[in-house]
A protein has these predicted regions:
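Multi-pass alpha-helical membrane architecture of UbiA-family
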Residues: 1-302
Length: 302
């Protein structure tokens, strides 16, 4: 699909302000990966006092650097769509002029990689994966965000899986315990469903611009059912694994959380588009609290 030439408003070409760059990096999106990072820190079982400096560096890496950079990448490659849907965003409004948005994305990637490898080789390797996923999600030719199945999976893997792994690796000073990797993979897989629910807020716009989100592809009801099952089944695996490892209380608490989520899911299934925001504020909160519960459990056997 060809786009009309993208013209920067003449009055906005004087150069960006710091607040414009910060808006481009979307600080509100940093919380999920930083939460997952802290789950990784907790799950490692390593006392915080032993690695404070690396802990702070790792939090900056997971949030402002890798996640913030992914937002810059996404805004650059979505600038034509944003010019219609969100013309007030920094790039289409001209507050980030010319190709500066792309240069910020490239610089953010380089800085993220440098910080990752300064922390350690395992963290550096995880950063390579995270940065690669950010570009693959938004940029041609892969542009996974245009695929309703792969887009949420890549986003969930980066936000939850890579961030949790990074937190555990920072504290462990190397490769995390295999049991930690099992749990983070389950929660990353389950977060696919959370990402699908996020797509309900833009169903009309996605259909208009040819974005094949899952609700657009298979209908809202079917997409909601898949999202719910995708969130629930990995948590069942987490419950079983924690119990097998002797972590009965954490297992029971995650099971209780899942039972509460199942009740809330019924409301989503009744009216997916209308009730997805409600679930994101309630069921997703229970989901991420389950992540932290599992992390505290893993710390007992680290």
């Amino acid at each position: 699909m060809e786009h009309a030439p993208f013209v920067i408003p003449a009055q906005a070409r004087s150069g960006p302000q710091l607040r414009d760059v910060l808006e481009l990096l979307k600080p509100v999106t940093w919380f999920p990966p930083m939460w997952a990072f802290m789950c990784g820190v907790v799950s490692s079982g390593v006392p915080l006092a032993d690695r404070w400096g690396l802990l702070i560096a790792g939090m900056m890496l997971a949030g402002p650097l890798v996640c913030g950079n992914s937002q810059a990448i996404n805004d650059w490659f979505d600038r034509h769509v944003d010019a219609v849907n969100e013309p007030q965003r920094p790039i289409p409004s001209g507050r980030i002029p010319g190709r500066l948005g792309l240069y910020i994305a490239i610089a953010g990637s380089v800085i993220s990689l440098l910080v990752g490898f300064v922390i350690g080789p395992v963290v550096g390797a995880a950063t390579v994966v995270g940065v690669a996923m950010a570009w693959a999600y938004s940029a041609p030719p892969l542009r996974f965000k245009a695929n309703g199945w792969l887009g949420p999976l890549v986003c969930a893997g980066a936000y939850e899986g890579v961030s949790w792994f990074t937190g555990a690796a920072v504290m462990a000073g190397g490769m995390p315990d295999a049991r930690i990797i099992w749990i983070l993979c389950m929660y990353a897989l389950g977060a696919h469903g959370i990402m699908v629910l996020n797509d309900f807020k833009a169903v009309k716009g996605d259909a208009q611009f040819g974005v094949n989100s899952l609700p657009v592809q298979i209908g809202e009801r079917n997409a909601a059912e898949i999202a719910c099952w995708t969130m629930a089944l990995p948590q069942v695996v987490v419950i079983i694994l924690l119990a097998r490892w002797g972590l009965h209380w954490p297992s029971a608490m995650v099971a209780f959380s899942l039972a509460m989520q199942a009740v809330l899911m019924q409301r989503v299934l009744a009216a997916p588009a209308a009730n997805a925001p409600f679930y994101n504020a309630t069921g997703t909160t229970l989901y991420v609290l389950g992540m932290l519960t599992a992390a505290f459990g893993l710390a007992q056997i680290a």
